[in-house]
Amino acid sequence: MPELPEVETSRRGISPYLVDHTILYAEVRNTRLRWPVSGEILSLSDEPVLSVRRRAKYLLIELTRGWIIVHLGMSGSLRVLPEYSEPEKHDHVDLVMDSGKVLRYTDPRRFGAWLWTDNPETCSVLAHLGPEPLEAEFSADYLYQASRGKKTAIKQWIMDNKVVVGVGNIYASESLFAAGIHPDRAAGSLNENDAAVLVSVIKQVLQLSIEQGGTTLRDFLQSDGKPGYFAQELRVYGRNGEPCRTCGTPIETAKHGQRSTFFCRRCQK
């Protein structure tokens, strides 16, 4: 599933081709995504694009009369192509631009979404999200105070979008390893130093992944069709049974909330 770095990589890739350009029309070949494609998108015509933003794992395309909200789901990707590029089986949505380019949405599993809102601040899918991990609001003091009394395993807790957005499965495993924190520890067991270290490494891991263009494990491609390269930096994720790159102990795996967690028993306490 594309996580925050992959969505931010997509945002940076598509923005130059959308902002200060006009959407001539949308071509929707399949409206049956996770939710039906909003009618306002189906009827787009000569809509200037003012900005492309990201909130959590949602892309927000600002138009003069409203906002398109895009979620990539489990297998979605966005590419910028010449206007008359022949669509393939899983190419469901095109935004045809006045520049002769098309923004094409591909989603084999169709768990993504193309929604419309007049105001992102009141949109139901955005209203209850926690702070952005790369912003100042996500601080050591915030994480420490929020974790008080929490018995949930720290891995599962930091993946809760009400706590902090965008720390998905890959980056939760990698951040906890970098912080030396065992994923089974109760969130409430963190002391102030633990919280400071964890906040710092979450920011570092996410920023490094963005700089590397995200992580390509299966479906994710950047807007130019190239893979993300952060997979080469992974220390624990997907390495079950392989030696820890720090101490040599075999990497182990466990389940947290139906998701696989990877960790080093020796390095993480």
UniProtKB/Swiss-Prot annotation:
InterPro entries: DNA_glyclase/AP_lyase_DNA-bd (IPR015886), DNA_glyclase_Znf_dom_DNA_BS (IPR015887), Formamido-pyr_DNA_Glyclase (IPR020629), FPG_cat (IPR012319), MutM-like_N-ter (IPR035937), Ribosomal_uS13-like_H2TH (IPR010979), Znf_DNA_glyclase/AP_lyase (IPR000214), Znf_FPG/IleRS (IPR010663). SUPFAM superfamilies: Glucocorticoid receptor-like (DNA-binding domain), N-terminal domain of MutM-like DNA repair proteins, S13-like H2TH domain. DNA binds at H90, R109, K150. The keyword DNA damage applies. Binds 1 zinc ion per subunit. Transmembrane segments: none annotated. Keywords: DNA damage, DNA repair, DNA-binding, Glycosidase, Hydrolase, Lyase, Metal-binding, Multifunctional enzyme, Zinc, Zinc-finger. It comes from the Bacteria. The active site is at P2, E3, K57, R259. It holds the Pfam family H2TH. It catalyses: Hydrolysis of DNA containing ring-opened 7-methylguanine residues, releasing 2,6-diamino-4-hydroxy-5-(N-methyl)formamidopyrimidine; 2'-deoxyribonucleotide-(2'-deoxyribose 5'-phosphate)-2'-deoxyribonucleotide-DNA = a 3'-end 2'-deoxyribonucleotide-(2,3-dehydro-2,3-deoxyribose 5'-phosphate)-DNA + a 5'-end 5'-phospho-2'-deoxyribonucleoside-DNA + H(+). Its EC number is 3.2.2.23, 4.2.99.18. Its cofactor is Zn(2+). PROSITE patterns: FPG_CAT (PS51068), ZF_FPG_1 (PS01242), ZF_FPG_2 (PS51066). Monomer. Involved in base excision repair of DNA damaged by oxidation or by mutagenic agents. Acts as a DNA glycosylase that recognizes and removes damaged bases. Has a preference for oxidized purines, such as 7,8-dihydro-8-oxoguanine (8-oxoG). Has AP (apurinic/apyrimidinic) lyase activity and introduces nicks in the DNA strand. Cleaves the DNA backbone by beta-delta elimination to generate a single-strand break at the site of the removed base with both 3'- and 5'-phosphates. Belongs to the FPG family. This is Formamidopyrimidine-DNA glycosylase.
